[in-house]
Amino acid sequence: ATFRVLAKVLAELGKVSRKIAVGVDNESGGSWTALNAYFRSGTTDVILPDLVPNQKALLYRGGKDTGPVATGVVGVLAYAMSDGNTLAILFSVPYDYNLYSNWWNVKVYSGKRRADQGMSEDLSYGNPYGGDNGWHARKLAYGLKERGFMKSSAQSILEIHATKA
């Protein structure tokens, strides 16, 4: 995924005040199959892409609930990897920037595991990155590493590259 493609995905969300476009490049050597998307707050109007082959990208978007509600968008995407483990991606774009800021995280879980509130909390409190307009990288489990970038704005972009370690 490139910033240009993600900017187009973001624009398709229209005038939603808290929104995000997520792009995850699969450079893992295997394929990924969608398990689910879990939203702690916010929603989406698109279906989670079912299959992400190696050398392709997952593109997704989310936004705050419509109407006069004081929420942002916080979600987790879960993908079963062809090695039998689960790739999870957390994104958070808060409603109130006086109290919170954007953040994100990536983790590989052992076995097949759907995204839920427990996974959301694990990723939220498991040393997430700030959405600080900077690149961050770390080794993940099971032979993977990630490198990613998230904008600090209320209309955010999250770009992640998952590669062999």
UniProtKB/Swiss-Prot annotation:
Which Gene Ontology cellular component terms are annotated? extracellular region; nematocyst; other organism cell membrane; pore complex
| Annotated GO MF terms | channel activity; toxin activity
State whether it acts alone or in a complex, and with which partners, per the record.
Octamer or nonamer in membranes. Monomer in the soluble state.
Q: Which domain of life is it from?
A: Eukaryota
Key word Repeat present in the record?
A: no
Q: Keyword Iron-sulfur: yes or no? A: no
The beginning of the lineage is: Eukaryota, Metazoa, Cnidaria, Anthozoa, Hexacorallia
Query: One short Pfam family name for this protein?
Result: Anemone_cytotox
What segment(s) does the record annotate as region N-terminal region?
Answer: 1-17
Q: Where is this site: Important in the initial contact with the lipid membrane?
A: Y100
Return the protein name: DELTA-actitoxin-Oor1a
Residue positions annotated to bind phosphocholine are S41, V74, S92, P94, Y125
Localization in the cell: Secreted; Nematocyst; Target cell membrane
